[in-house]
């Protein structure tokens, strides 16, 4: 019985010693991240879709900050994200990249044919923004307001019941061009 307690104590002391060494090493040799990269990464939509030419949002943020990559390549984020990054970096806003511009006018969302869905959860695992809900062996559905249209859920589906469809434009989703209507400011005099 004494041998068991000695072994337990020895393993516990070794675990404590190695934990202390790892804790010290993590603080001593810590590498600080670039705060600009962190801020750009927070602005990006985190869809990890790869439409910008990078494998995810973090590598694209690093390329913008460190390599001077264009700020207009995020198709899911569109113009709103580009304007926020331009404001953060204090640079001139750029028109959307040609590839991104082609993708942004017709916003696409995933639609699941629920009659053919077998509930395998492969689409849920593939979705980077958790826009698909459902349980194992039950039909799944897409929350269209969260879907970025990244197309990552289509290929894993074994029954091919997922397709991307354009979102119908409404007054809320329409991109209004406010520069086409000239607006003149009329001074108002207040009389007391």
Curated annotation (Swiss-Prot):
Keywords: 4Fe-4S, Cell inner membrane, Cell membrane, Electron transport, Iron, Iron-sulfur, Membrane, Metal-binding, Repeat, Translocase, Transport
GO BP, sorted A to Z: electron transport chain
Organism in which the protein naturally occurs: Escherichia coli O1:K1 / APEC
Taxonomy of the source species: Bacteria, Pseudomonadati, Pseudomonadota, Gammaproteobacteria, Enterobacterales
Protein name in the entry: Ion-translocating oxidoreductase complex subunit B
Functional description taken from the UniProt entry: Part of a membrane-bound complex that couples electron transfer with translocation of ions across the membrane. Required to maintain the reduced state of SoxR.
Annotated Gene3D superfamilies: 3.30.70.20, Electron transport complex subunit B, putative Fe-S cluster
Gene name of the record: rsxB
Subcellular location(s) per record: Cell inner membrane
SUPFAM superfamilies reported in the protein's UniProt record: 4Fe-4S ferredoxins (SSF54862)
């Amino acid at each position: 019985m004494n041998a068991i307690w000695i072994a337990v104590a020895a393993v516990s002391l070794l675990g404590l010693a190695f934990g202390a060494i790892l804790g010290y090493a993590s603080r001593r040799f810590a590498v600080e991240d670039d705060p600009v990269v962190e801020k750009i990464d927070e602005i990006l939509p985190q869809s990890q879709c790869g439409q910008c030419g990078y494998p995810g949002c973090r590598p694209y943020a690093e390329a913008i900050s460190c390599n001077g990559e264009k700020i207009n390549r995020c198709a899911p984020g569109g113009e709103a994200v580009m304007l926020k990054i331009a404001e953060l970096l204090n640079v001139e806003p750029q028109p959307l990249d040609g590839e991104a511009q082609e993708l942004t006018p017709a916003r696409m969302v995933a639609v699941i044919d629920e009659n053919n869905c077998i509930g395998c959860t492969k689409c849920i695992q593939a979705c980077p923004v958790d826009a698909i809900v459902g349980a194992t062996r039950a039909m799944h559905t897409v929350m269209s307001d969260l879907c970025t249209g990244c197309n990552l859920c289509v290929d894993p589906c074994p029954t091919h019941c997922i397709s991307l469809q354009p979102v119908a434009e409404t007054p809320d989703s329409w991109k209004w061009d406010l520069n086409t209507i000239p607006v003149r400011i009329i001074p108002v005099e207040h009389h007391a």
